[in-house]
Amino acid sequence: FSPLAFEDLPDGRRVFYSGTGCGHVVCIDARTGQALWRFQMSYGGVNSGVVIHEDTVVAIHGKENVDSTVIGRMVAIRKPASLPGVGEEILVLGKEAEVWRNNSMEAFTSTPAYRNGRLYSTIKRGELVCVDAETGEDVWVLKLAPDQVHASPLWADGKLFVPMFDGRISVVVDEGDSGRVLGKTTLDGACLAAPSAAHGRVFVQTKKRLYCFGSPLPAPAFVAKPQEELKHLLTGPPIGSAVSLQVVPAEFALKSGTSQAFKVYALDRTGRRIEE
């Protein structure tokens, strides 16, 4: 399943963008679940995570395209200027929403990294490709392995950490017109996931081991964020009057002789709870 990319819109709504198993990129209201728009890319799943670049959403897939037999494509989709209101129909975006396409890109589940207007994507041929997010043109290409399936690159500390299917991981620096490998090693087991970074360390999971690279100093103790600090995502000053109701829980199972209590919240047009 595609990792979600969240965005807070000027109108107060919080949305997320994702690929779907039916070949679409979708925009969903994160508070209410309302589907706002969709754009079909392929006849198979869009399994990689999408990237937000200014007023576009960039996505890549590794299936057959809807308008040709070409396999794989990276596309920049322009976000619509206005979105449906509560209860209105989903927007179906067509080719007019396509800003650019790059037919040389094919990735099954690898999610691009994004930094300063550039996309860094590993593709099926085992290459790391730097793409200009404004134009869709390749900036540079590095061959790092025979092939690639699932793993994704990570941008951290001014460098790219790039795991590959054959167990190799490379540290790459973007030098403008080219990419340069600072170092590389081969790990035990295939790399299928994206690395993670925290407290000066990089964590890499293979099919056989979990590796930690970086600072030998003890990491600070983990402190969970108090739930109160996250309340602004659901509640806040109302924007207008209530426009919809939210029943909680939305999903439940009852056995004979049991009961279920519900809460009903009034939501404003941004999906925030304003009254119980």
Regions found by a protein language model. Give the residues of each.
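Short flexible loop/turn segments that cap and initiate beta-strands
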Residues: L267-E276
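Noncatalytic, solvent-exposed loop/strand surfaces
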Residues: F1-V247, F252, S256-K263, R269
